[in-house]
Amino acid sequence: MNFSLLTTEMLTALLGIGLLAIGLLNRKKDSHRGVAYAAVFGLLGILVVTFFQYGINTNTFHQLWILDDYSVFMKEIFLVAAILVILSAIDYVDGLPRFKTEFYALLVFATLGMMVMASANDLVTLYVGMELMTITFFILVAYILGDGRSSEAGVKYLLLGGASSAVLLYGLSLLYGLTGTTVIPDLLARLTWSPALAIAVVTIIAGFGFKISAVPFHMWSPDIYEGAPTPVTGFLAAASKAAGFAVLVRLFLEGMPLQGGADWLTVIAVLAGVTMVIGNVVAIPQTNIKRMLAYSSVAQAGYLLVGLMSTDAPGVKGILFYAMLYVVANMGAFAVATAVGRAIGSDEIADYAGLSQRQPLLASVMTISLLSLAGIPPLAGFVGKLYLFSAIMDKGVLWPAFLGFVMSMVSVYYYLNVSLYMWRDDPKDDRPIPVSGPMKLTVIFSMVVTVILGIYPGPLAEVATVAAKSLF
């Protein structure tokens, strides 16, 4: 047993426990800011550690745990998302009545759950990591004490999340019953086609469909995203979705008979197509920025599912690259939503009118983030979609790429609608919106990375290629 393969997870666990201890020992009014900075520097240190884990590609604990380049890349996505959400949440947490320091500890523990999911090579390990992530989100979604919308969102997420976890666990238990093992690679060697396997695969797809907000398992996301604290919404929409795909890719490429008995690629293709269409079309009439971004995140899941359809290294490379840029752009958009919502007390798109006059930086970051999500060149989103769609086109399947292109053009409408409010209309209030140092750092980082990855994607694409090849 090689405990060194768990270095990043052990450090993350120690960081979360340390943050809780600091919060208990120091109850001063502004102590949460010090805790936030400690969390950021701790996560940055862990991120640096991951750079030295490339090339290991081995497992331990009787194959229950795997550390390969794929899992390392995914962990870096989660860590980047966690750092950005903590920086963007510092001012927001100022307005919370109680339990300020615990907020950051919960974000760290949610990140730990995602990291466990990425390295899980066993169904039980996978489920433990997923539940660690999910339970912390149950708390974070309902974190605004005395707020009816937040409490309602928390209850909805608890009930629906618990139901989806039960469905997923049923599917995993069927796999164990069919094969006698919970080690994912062994499933491929032992699985034979049967009706029970069909039920198992359907329930697993349903369970993870909830986690990634794929249609028709997406209905929870708009209400939960709207009611949850805005920084939590961003983290849930970006990092949690990436964690779901981290597992889906490993399960379906290593442990599922995608071409045996029935064509499960067809199921994935249908999910991808419907998810892209429903997510983009329903986003058009939304008047609340968080609900609009919720349906946008549904559509983004459809694009990522197109990459899964290719079942090869280029497709996985596209998923990894797009997941990273999606996290960065999405966190930038939600950081702006956090700052604006805190300043004006509203999340309505109409209230973004004249934002370019009140705070040009926030308007610029929101515009670039939304255009990147739409796939407009020369931003990173264009390159990411190019990788995803070209991977499936190389397989000779053209319709997902064509549908994805059409739906990307549809998304331009509702993304530009927000931009028009910000740049064309006059503000209802002339007072400038304050932007603190941590928030400014978050949005500038998001904007710069989104632009640079669009112009010069080579280095990240090369790392994503290496990570993808570790699965094959």
UniProtKB/Swiss-Prot annotation:
GO cellular component: a single term: plasma membrane
Q: Which domain of life is it from?
A: Bacteria
- Identify one Pfam family in the record: Proton_antipo_M
The upper taxonomy is: Bacteria, Bacillati, Bacillota, Clostridia, Eubacteriales
Q: Subunit structure, briefly?
A: NDH-1 is composed of 14 different subunits. Subunits NuoA, H, J, K, L, M, N constitute the membrane sector of the complex.
Q: Which InterPro entries match?
A: NADH-Q_OxRdtase_suN/2, ND/Mrp_TM
Q: Of which family is this protein a member?
A: Belongs to the complex I subunit 2 family.
**What EC number is given for this enzyme?**
7.1.1.-
Compartments (UniProt record): Cell membrane
| Reaction catalyzed | a quinone + NADH + 5 H(+)(in) = a quinol + NAD(+) + 4 H(+)(out)
Tell me, what does this protein do in biology?
NDH-1 shuttles electrons from NADH, via FMN and iron-sulfur (Fe-S) centers, to quinones in the respiratory chain. The immediate electron acceptor for the enzyme in this species is believed to be a menaquinone. Couples the redox reaction to proton translocation (for every two electrons transferred, four hydrogen ions are translocated across the cytoplasmic membrane), and thus conserves the redox energy in a proton gradient.
Organism of origin is: Heliobacterium modesticaldum (strain ATCC 51547 / Ice1)
Q: Example GO biological process term?
A: ATP synthesis coupled electron transport
Q: What is this protein called?
A: NADH-quinone oxidoreductase subunit N
Has the keyword Transcription been applied to this entry? no
- Membrane-traversing stretches: 5-25, 36-56, 77-97, 103-123, 126-146, 158-178, 197-217, 229-249, 264-284, 292-309, 319-339, 363-383, 396-416, 441-461
Keywords, in A-Z order: Cell membrane, Membrane, NAD, Quinone, Translocase, Transmembrane, Transmembrane helix, Transport
| Membrane topology, as annotated | Multi-pass membrane protein
User: Which molecular function terms from Gene Ontology are attached?
Assistant: NADH dehydrogenase (ubiquinone) activity; NADH:ubiquinone reductase (non-electrogenic) activity; quinone binding
